[in-house]
């Protein structure tokens, strides 16, 4: 790479970083951190464990955001020094090191730039993920479980806290449905591009004749409700059913009727939770999910009105959005962005960052 090219490249990186820093507003983030640190130091912090958890989680996330931005700025500044050293010493090894670091910095800058695209009304929220098996019988149930593991591994690899609210197991293998929370800021904005129908094509391990099977699973991503959303639920409009929690194959995992199913009579929305130890805890978790679904319903109604005014058909999130092909070739492909990976095993193991980044950029383009 010529000296002039390097100079222009570094100027471009620095300019992009300045734009990112302006959008992130690091001074405001530092001020927010100071406020949260003061709240976290209060002796009464853990009097309300749920509020305390939110404060410490948000504090940790903001601190990581600032550290990440500061570290990336430092790497960009160090790059110019590294290239100068390579030029002055005419050292091929130093130049190779500098060019390798340049590639790595570009990638890190792209990832951070994606974060600045999460500017929607609910993008900064934590997320509720609901996965359900659709057409395809036992293969669909197995596929739904693979998707659950994929998202949980993705979160685990990044140190994000998750909480499984409910998992309904299928009789032979896999799951009928599951609901879990990803408890980190911007989880909703990041994961919302995953909403839609996912398709799996493979030789079915459940078919004695070894035939190719196509199965489907639906993914729904909801923002966690906050008090400012004013989602109020009248208890008289709820039907509450309690039952015994069950595990794989229908086996009971609890000797008491601690699982809770809520039916919101005006809308017909049904949610359930069985993973907590007590009926009270399960009902509270189920209420959180119900509130999120009601918020999403309200949001969709408002969007439909806006689309009608604009003459726009709106986003068809319910349509098929990604295919996972294991036979006759191996490929995972997003049907909206055309982003694809030839290693399905890695994808199912949580390596979905490329799909998320491509989806977020695609969504931003659709909004223009």
Curated annotation (Swiss-Prot):
GO terms for cellular component: cytoplasm. It is found in: Cytoplasm. The keyword Protein biosynthesis applies. The keyword Signal does not apply. Keywords: Cytoplasm, Methylation, Protein biosynthesis. Belongs to the prokaryotic/mitochondrial release factor family. This is Peptide chain release factor 2. The gene is prfB.
């Amino acid at each position: 790479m010529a000296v002039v090219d390097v100079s222009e490249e570094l100027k471009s990186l620095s300019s992009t970083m300045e734009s990112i820093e302006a959008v992130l507003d690091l001074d405001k983030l530092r001020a927010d951190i100071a406020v949260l640190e003061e709240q976290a130091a209060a002796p009464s912090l853990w009097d309300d464990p749920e509020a305390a958890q939110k404060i410490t989680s948000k504090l940790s996330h903001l601190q990581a955001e600032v550290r990440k931005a500061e570290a990336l700025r430092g790497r960009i500044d160090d790059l110019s020094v590294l290239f100068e050293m390579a030029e002055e010493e005419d050292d091929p090894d130093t130049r190779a090191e500098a060019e390798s670091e340049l590639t790595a910095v570009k990638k890190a800058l792209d990832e951070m730039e994606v974060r600045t695209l999460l500017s929607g009304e609910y993008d900064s929220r934590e997320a509720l993920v609901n996965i359900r098996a659709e057409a395809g019988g036992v293969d669909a149930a197995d596929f739904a479980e693979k998707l659950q593991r994929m998202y949980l591994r993705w979160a685990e690899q990044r140190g994000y806290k998750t909480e499984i609210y409910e998992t309904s197991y299928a009789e032979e293998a896999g799951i009928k449905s599951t609901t879990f929370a990803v408890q980190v800021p911007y989880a909703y904005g990041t994961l919302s591009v995953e909403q839609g129908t996912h398709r799996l094509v493979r030789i079915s391990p459940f078919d004695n004749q070894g035939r190719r099977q196509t199965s489907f699973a639906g993914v729904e991503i909801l923002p966690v409700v906050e008090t400012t959303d004013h989602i109020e639920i009248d208890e008289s409009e709820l039907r509450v059913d309690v039952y015994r929690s069950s595990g794989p194959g229908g086996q009971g995992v609890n000797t008491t009727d601690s699982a809770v199913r809520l039916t919101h009579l005006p809308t017909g929305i049904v949610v359930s939770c069985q993973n907590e130890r007590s009926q009270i805890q399960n009902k509270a978790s189920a209420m959180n999910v119900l509130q999120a679904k009601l918020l999403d319903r309200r949001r969709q109604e408002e969007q439909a009105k806006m689309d009608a005014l604009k003459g726009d058909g709106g986003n068809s999130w319910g349509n098929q959005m990604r295919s996972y092909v294991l036979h006759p070739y191996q490929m995972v492909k997003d049907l909206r962005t055309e982003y694809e990976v030839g290693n399905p095993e890695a994808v199912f193991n949580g390596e979905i960052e490329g799909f998320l980044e491509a989806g977020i950029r695609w969504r931003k383009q659709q909004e223009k």
